[in-house]
Regions:
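Soluble or luminal CAZymes and related metallo-dependent hydrolases
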Residues: 17, 58, 62, 112-115, ...
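Radical SAM [4Fe-4S] cluster-binding motif and immediate context
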Residues: 58, 216-219, 229-249
């Protein structure tokens, strides 16, 4: 199964675009108090050699990279939860720095898909008080629509799926935060951004069309992401380690 590609002349981001986007996000200081949880799903049925030891001793790079770039973009309240370390994690009960989480980012490989679905469903149990739910990782990149209308009730699913790398997430956050009023829940700002059509201009996203209904959902795919050419634009990979949730039940 091969993913589509952009034209050779349009594969990469313009040099400097990544760092410029992080700098613009640093200027949006009203958003820096958002509580962001990055959850890495893990299915314990997949624990087997040769990964028996490494799976519980190594923090995956993907979620650490997200924390690195969010920290470099000015966000202060970040936490990475690894389900292999904290198997009973429930987003609906999660509190970060004394407050419920505002954004839940779920990352999963294909073999860990089922627990990732349950993380999304659990967050949706909060109803109107639920966080903005974003899905990503290999599972989401290849089968993004599996995260929409997951049931058992209508409307249960992720708000948006990133089918690209970290820059796609930065562009999404920037677009939503520009539409966000002071003190407004970020999920409300996302809904308004989605209805405005702004998200259609960000390659690498999949979300439900605002004109679709729960009984006939229609997904919008904004196209193939652009890739980062100069990896020196990435921040130092240290903040991700500092915001790891320690192992506990």
């Amino acid at each position: 199964m091969e993913l589509p590609r952009r034209k050779p002349s349009d594969v990469h981001l313009p040099d400097g675009a990544f760092t410029q986007t992080m700098e613009r996000l640093r200027q949006l200081q009203d958003a820096h108090d958002l509580c962001i949880c990055i959850a890495y799903a893990f299915d314990f049925r997949t624990r087997m050699l040769p990964y028996w030891y490494a799976d519980k001793r190594m923090a995956p790079c993907s979620v650490r990279t997200l924390a690195d770039i969010l920290h470099a973009s000015g966000f202060k309240h970040l936490r990475i939860v690894l389900q292999q370390w904290t198997p009973n994690f429930r987003p609906s009960e999660a509190v970060l720095d004394g407050r419920p989480i505002d954004v839940l980012m779920v990352s999963s490989m294909q073999v860990h898909a089922e627990p990732s679905y349950e993380l999304v469903r659990d967050a949706c149990r909060l109803g109107d008080a639920r966080p903005l739910i974003l899905a990503g990782g290999p599972k989401a990149i290849y089968e993004p629509t599996d995260y929409f209308e997951m049931g058992p009730e209508p409307g249960v699913g992720a708000d948006c799926v990133a089918v690209g790398e970290a820059y796609v997430l930065l562009e999404l956050l920037e677009a939503v935060l520009k539409h966000r009023a002071s003190g407004e829940p970020i999920r409300s700002a996302f809904d308004r951004t989605r209805r405005s059509g702004t998200l259609a201009g960000i390659p690498g996203l999949v979300y439900l069309s605002p004109d679709s209904s729960p009984d006939r959902p229609v997904a919008v795919h904004t196209g193939v992401q652009r890739l980062l050419r100069n990896l020196d634009e990435m921040p130092m990979p240290d903040a991700g380690y500092r915001v790891l949730e320690p192992p506990h039940r």
